[in-house]
Amino acid sequence: MANSRRVSRVSSLIKREVSQMLLHDIKDDRVGAGMVSVTEVDVSGDLQHATIFVSIYGSEQAQAETMEGLKSSTSFVRRELSHRMRLRRSPEVVFRQDHSLERGDRMVHLLNQIKDTIPEEEGITEEE
């Protein structure tokens, strides 16, 4: 079992490499249907499994197409990781869609709606 510092380093390295693959190496047109970015990579303690969280900007259909393209390219990503990284075994790769940015955006939108509906009280300004 790898120590937590090594797991963290491998995780950040996988994030960087997969981001580069998304930009330059994955040729599947479905992956280009939505704007994709790697938000986080969770690597198991034994470095055998990597869950790659991606944020996809686009319509629901574009997001679904992009996830299908990513799922079909997992073997390519795993093979490329084995070439680019010095690991005894290349981790099994699973792509998951990260909805946290969408939830955060929705939360900001709701807070702005609340702010607009509440009348400003006397003596209270936004500068405080």
Curated annotation (Swiss-Prot):
Its main location: cytoplasm. PANTHER family: RIBOSOME-BINDING FACTOR A, CHLOROPLASTIC-RELATED. Keywords: Cytoplasm, Ribosome biogenesis. Pfam families: RBFA (PF02033). This is Ribosome-binding factor A. It is found in: Cytoplasm. Monomer. Binds 30S ribosomal subunits, but not 50S ribosomal subunits or 70S ribosomes. GO terms for molecular function: ribosomal small subunit binding. It comes from Rippkaea orientalis (strain PCC 8801 / RF-1) (Cyanothece sp. (strain PCC 8801)). Belongs to the RbfA family. One of several proteins that assist in the late maturation steps of the functional core of the 30S ribosomal subunit. Associates with free 30S ribosomal subunits (but not with 30S subunits that are part of 70S ribosomes or polysomes). Required for efficient processing of 16S rRNA. May interact with the 5'-terminal helix region of 16S rRNA. One of its GO terms (biological process) is maturation of SSU-rRNA. GO terms for cellular component: cytosol. The keyword Cytoplasm applies. It comes from the Bacteria. NCBIfam families: rbfA.
